[in-house]
Amino acid sequence: MGAIDSGNTAWILTSASLVFLMTPGVAFFYGGMVRAKAVLNMLMLEAAALSVTMIIWTLWGWSIAYAGSDIGGIFGDPASGFLLKDSMVAQDGVFTATGLNGNNYPVSVDVAFQVAFAMITVGLICGAIAERVKYSTWMIFVALWVTFDYAPMAHMVWNGGLLSADGAISKAIGAAAHDFAGGTVVHINAAVAALIIVL
């Protein structure tokens, strides 16, 4: 393992912290848009989105999106990074980050940054289902959506899959697709899911 770049690590952790703050911000925004009796429900839906997404991302979501071998350009091998395998190791009772990504910051830092985007993406969908869904149904939806929609889309766009700049579709049409700010994975993905839910 090479040397950790402390500047890159600090910047990614700062960025992850700021993105984490977006989810409660969206919760309060959506809470202000619903009737007074539905504010608590909206806040709880956002809290469920945050909690379930973090659990799914830790178990297998990150692995589907970023770890291991590519399966048809659609998703990564869910078992290759199950439970963030090989990104942290316990040494003398202390968890230590192992492995560096291409920018010399720990993989575990990248996991934190990416889960923040996964959480805000699910949180954006909440506005479409205000006062329309039971809490338990929403939790099941979040688990399934992160597993079968968000993580594969993140893989396809951000990890060299079908829709990436180097992907098969870009090569077939002769024009590279670039998604630097998350327009496809975050905004289009959440908008289409919200539209499908309300229809």
Where do the PLM segments sit?
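Hydrophobic alpha-helical transmembrane bundles of multi-pass membrane proteins
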Residues: 1-199
